[in-house]
Amino acid sequence: MPYILPRSFCDTKQNVNIISQASDLKPGSRKVCVAIGMFDGVHLGHQQVIRQTIEDARQHEGIAVAITFDRHPNSVVAPDRNPPLIYSLSQKLRVIESLGIDTTLLIHFDKEFSQIPGEEFIQGLARDCGAIHSLCVGSAFSFGHKRSGNVVLLKRLGQELHFIVHGLASVSLDGRTVSSTRIRESIGAGNLDVASQMLGRTYALAGTVIRGDQFGRQLGFPTANLDPHDLVIPPNGVYAAHAQVQGRFHRAVVNIGTRPTLQNPKPKLQVEAHLLDVSPDLYGQEMEIAFVEKLREEQKFSSTDALQQQIQRDIEAARRLF
């Protein structure tokens, strides 16, 4: 899959309409069309659910609402099975909005929320949102305390509360189901093209730029150090990449790894981006990195001089790709 800067990576809009409780929606006389899901990665299957909701809203002059969560439910109910996320929360919200959703209801998923039975959750949603016209989910969607709710329950509640339920079948690509789990596996294995195909856009890693130990600057190659909190990370190595930060795009060389040349007794996985030709102050900013090509594996060098020389070769190799 050729590298493309897709709309979702290029979209720098920050005017996402987000509410934290259903009673804040205030649709007036408009019908409410709802999509519900974790939507990690907002992949092709998620997009199908969201677009069905948008279509319903447009056909009935309603409002399209996405309901999602601020963390993975497993982080609360099953921490030992909590997966790393594909997207940061801000990434996810931006991509959902870019699809055409009018409002996103972002639910804080905590212990108290996890105890709400599925039926009670939907009844409360219908009460607080006003006139729900339709509710769209994936066919395998489950919800409520101990995952007690499913599409069958939704359809029963839809009959009682007078809303339409869409339980959409999963999307397949090359004969296999598109899922967040498969995308995480692809990213972790370095199959970023496969992940991008399932996402429907070029995969990008996001995180906040944090203060590092200035080692790159000492070598003459200052880096923006990323804190990709709780996210799945591509394999260790050196990559040519594009970085988006503060609404601007920069060519970059990115190192993912533990910097073995430094012989740190407590090595820590780091994501470091050297932006070519610029060295802005980016601390505290969110950066997105879209990987163009892996240049080499991470390796241990005999000296910092040897490391400097290799970094210069990496930069030259990256420039030839842009």
Kindly give the residue locations of the regions a language model identified:
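A structural preference for short, hydrophobic beta-strand core positions in alpha/beta folds
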Residues: 66, 106, 165-168
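Residue-level signal for inorganic ion chemistry
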Residues: 43, 96, 135, 195, ...
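Phosphate/ribose-recognition catalytic cores of enzymes acting on nucleotide-derived substrates
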Residues: 212-322
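Glycine-rich, Lys/Arg-enriched anion-binding loops that position phosphate/diphosphate groups
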Residues: 158-257
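Positively charged, low-complexity intrinsically disordered leader regions
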Residues: 2-32
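N-terminal Rossmann-like or analogous alpha/beta NTP/dinucleotide-binding catalytic cores
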Residues: 75-161
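N-terminal catalytic cores of NTP/NDP-binding nucleotidyl/phosphoryl-transfer enzymes
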Residues: 26-88
